[in-house]
Amino acid sequence: MKKLVYTAVLFALLAPLAAWSHPSIDIVASNWKFTPGTITVHLNEPATLRLTSSGGVHGIASSELGIPKTTILPNSYVTVTFTPKKLGTYEIHCAIICGAGHSDMEIIVKVVQ
């Protein structure tokens, strides 16, 4: 019984460390911009984006980074996790036509060591 209690306590103490090693990045889509406009992720490490929209329907997708087409709705959150396999700087443009400034709506993803 003591082993079970010790195991449970150890698990409870280590679980937050696992979450800390893989934090999510909050991104807000609004009319014609993403905030933040640039993010940095690490090569061969999972990255989770937590996306929401403050107005309008937007989307992201990147075959280079392995991000499937993801719709971002107002006042709700959607998460997408990907593992970058190549160093570099990538531009992700809004994947859903959202108005006059749609072509300027992008987020820069920097993949570093």
Predicted regions and their residues:
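Positively charged n-region of N-terminal signal peptides that target proteins for export
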Residues: 1-5
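Bacterial N-terminal signal peptides
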Residues: 7-16
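N-terminal edge beta-strand
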Residues: 21-46
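Exposed beta-strand and adjacent loop surfaces of beta-rich binding modules
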Residues: 24, 46, 57-59, 89, ...
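Extracellular/periplasmic metallocenter environments
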Residues: 26, 73-113
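N-terminal post-signal-peptidase region of extra-cytosolic proteins
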Residues: 30-37, 64-67, 75-79, 92-93
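Non-cytosolic beta-sheet module surface loops
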Residues: 31, 51-53, 84
